């Protein structure tokens, strides 16, 4: 995903909005990163170096092409029936930003499978930790794709960034 890396490297603070939790509420104690959607909507502007709706679609498709085979393998291995995959969103975590313990499936956002595609690894902190399954934080590398069930059995968090800026793309399947 070199294209996404070069875009975020060139414009690291432009166009991201505060990330929300349930019902579009802001709570920086629970989730303090910023986000922008790769969903091509009518309000598109020049954000993060993406000058047009077509460029947004192209970047989303590029991420899809680089992650689809792994998703198909996961679905087959664990027997999920997927009817929809959401467009990818890019997340940016700056120093001290984090997300606390949570499951990705819940009202008003029902989903079955969560995907996180890591775009860089030139930061410190920001490890992913699963409460009951791994027990130790996981430090992803650029290009890693983490796929897991969105259920309460996979409660997880992102530890605070201690230096640098972390970029990841996320998507959910229903």
Range-by-range predicted roles:
Residues 53-174:
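Catalytic core of non-heme Fe(II) oxygenases with the double-stranded beta-helix
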Residues 1-78:
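Non-heme Fe(II)/2-oxoglutarate
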């Amino acid at each position: 995903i070199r294209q996404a890396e070069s875009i975020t490297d060139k414009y690291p603070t432009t166009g991201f909005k505060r990330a929300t939790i349930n019902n579009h509420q802001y709570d920086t104690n629970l989730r303090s990163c910023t986000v922008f959607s790769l969903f091509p909507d009518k309000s598109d502007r020049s954000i993060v170096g993406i000058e047009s709706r077509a460029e947004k679609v192209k970047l989303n498709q590029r991420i899809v092409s680089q992650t689809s085979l792994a998703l198909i393998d996961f679905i087959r291995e664990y027997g999920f029936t997927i009817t929809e995959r959401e467009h990818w969103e890019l997340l940016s975590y700056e120093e001290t930003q984090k997300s606390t313990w949570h499951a990705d499936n819940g009202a008003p956002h029902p989903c079955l499978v969560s995907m996180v595609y890591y775009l860089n690894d030139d930061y410190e902190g920001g490890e992913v930790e699963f409460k009951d399954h791994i027990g130790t934080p996981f430090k992803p590398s650029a290009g890693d794709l983490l796929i897991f069930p969105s259920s309460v059995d996979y409660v997880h968090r992102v530890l605070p960034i201690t230096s640098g800026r972390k970029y990841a793309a996320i998507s959910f399947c229903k």
